[in-house]
Amino acid sequence: MTELDINEIEAYNSNKMGWIELITGCMFAGKTEEFIRRLKVLSYAKKRVLAFKPSIDNRYSVENIISHSGSKLDSYLVKSSDEIKQIVEKENQIQQVDVIGIDEVQFFDENVVDIIEQLADNGIIVIVNGLDKDFRGLPFKNVDKLLVKAEFVTKLRARCHLCGSFANRSQRIVNGQPALWDSPLILVDGKESYEARCRKCFISPKKDV
């Protein structure tokens, strides 16, 4: 099972049980679109939802989480995982928080995984979105751990930019060519800097010698 329906959520919540849902995959796979959809469904179901995004990701908006297709959701822009915990604790004093959404989890510090677990242990549904692999094809931090810890995992695929086949890798492009191995790990530039690639079309970055 990769996602619960509202009736199943109500059954779990009757026991005040929290859990972790992870939405992952490569660039342009629709992760943020699915992330926003799930949080909106829960909001419509009268759950109190708070969403967070890392301050490094300001491609489209500072105040909203926005997908490549234009779907958007109000969010808190935070610099660290500790800010998430502080805001949730403050908001809980005003009204109970039922659901937390964390976008682009790979851009947060590594303490975010422990905080996500604490929130779930305290009865909060935590829905997380992030890339599973970096541009080198290696596991991305935080997502690699959440793949093990999450109760529900949805892995999405894109279409290969070159051949149209199923893609599960993110190719970083610099000056029309695949980036070198030693390029910075994090570069948030959207479609101008990345392409979804399949196994066959993905070019493993070369090490600069």
Swiss-Prot record:
Pfam families according to UniProt: TK (PF00265)
Enzyme Commission no: 2.7.1.21
Subcellular location: Cytoplasm
Positions that bind Zn(2+): 160, 163, 198, 201
Reactions that this protein is recorded to catalyse: thymidine + ATP = dTMP + ADP + H(+)
Signal sequence, start to end: none
Disulfide pairings: none
Keywords (A to Z) from UniProt: ATP-binding, Cytoplasm, DNA synthesis, Kinase, Metal-binding, Nucleotide-binding, Transferase, Zinc
Main location: cytoplasm
Positions of the catalytic residues: 104 (proton acceptor)
Bilayer-spanning residue ranges: none
GO MF annotations, alphabetized: ATP binding; thymidine kinase activity; zinc ion binding
Binding site for ATP: 25-32, 103-106
NCBIfam families named in the record: PRK04296.1-1
Subunit (UniProt): Homotetramer.
Family: Belongs to the thymidine kinase family.
PANTHER family, sorted: THYMIDINE KINASE (PTHR11441), THYMIDINE KINASE, CYTOSOLIC (PTHR11441:SF0)
Protein name per its UniProtKB record: Thymidine kinase
Organism of this sequence: Mycoplasma capricolum subsp. capricolum (strain California kid / ATCC 27343 / NCTC 10154)
Lineage: Bacteria, Bacillati, Mycoplasmatota, Mollicutes, Mycoplasmataceae
Gene coding for it: tdk
